[in-house]
Amino acid sequence: MVGLPTHTLSVLVEDTPGVLARVAALFSRRGFNIESLAVGATECKTMSRMTIVVSAEETPLEQVTKQLHKLINVIKVVEQEADNSLSRELALIKVRAEAGTRSQVIEAVHLFRARVIDVSLESLTVEATGDCSKIEALLRVLEPFGVREIVQSGVVSLSRGPRGIGTVR
């Protein structure tokens, strides 16, 4: 939704079947669109971490957060504040790069500290990591060359410093 503040939630869950479906269903029932979702292993083999990005007003988000805490298999929910956390995503971008423009594309890629991971006669595939604004800026620079295909991971986020989401109830 345009104009609503964006929130990043870290949700620590038990690594069991159906947890993702229950969490996603809760957001869906409340009318939230999940803008980004990444799920992966944690330092504890029995738990997974979900990073969920949504645009919402504070009060409705607080209600959803309280309901998340009530779900079986949800251990902890933390909102990652931008100034106290690090967030990154990965993008793979296939861009047209024929002989006449290839060096320009490679130069643009290097300016963003991205890297070329595949080369063909007519295209390059680029791997870029960074915050959302960096990925968006790279896409704007590559667009005039002809972006053929894009895939982006969801955002992943960790708190800065020694504090973390923890692994106990």
Curated annotation (Swiss-Prot):
Protein's GO biological process: isoleucine biosynthetic process; L-valine biosynthetic process
InterPro entries reported in the protein's UniProt record: Acetalactate_synth_ssu, Acetolactate_synth/TF_NikR_C, Acetolactate_synth_ssu_C, ACT-like_dom_sf, ACT_dom, AHAS_ACT, AHAS_small-like_ACT
Domain ACT: 8-85
GO function terms (MF aspect): acetolactate synthase activity; acetolactate synthase regulator activity
GO cellular component: cytosol
E.C. numbers: 2.2.1.6
Xref: Gene3D superfamilies: 3.30.70.260, ACT-like. Chain A, domain 2
Reactions listed under catalytic activity: 2 pyruvate + H(+) = (2S)-2-acetolactate + CO2
Root EC class: transferase
One Pfam family in the UniProt entry: ACT_AHAS_ss
Keyword terms of this UniProt record: Amino-acid biosynthesis, Branched-chain amino acid biosynthesis, Transferase
Keyword Transferase (UniProt): yes
Pathway info: Amino-acid biosynthesis; L-isoleucine biosynthesis; L-isoleucine from 2-oxobutanoate: step 1/4; Amino-acid biosynthesis; L-valine biosynthesis; L-valine from pyruvate: step 1/4
Alphabetized PROSITE patterns for the sequence: ACT (PS51671)
Record flagged with keyword RNA-binding: no
Top-level taxon of origin: Bacteria
Complexes and interactors: Dimer of large and small chains.
NCBIfam families cross-referenced by the UniProt entry: acolac_sm, PRK11895.1
Family (UniProt): Belongs to the acetolactate synthase small subunit family.
Protein name: Acetolactate synthase small subunit
UniProt source species: Mycobacterium leprae (strain TN)
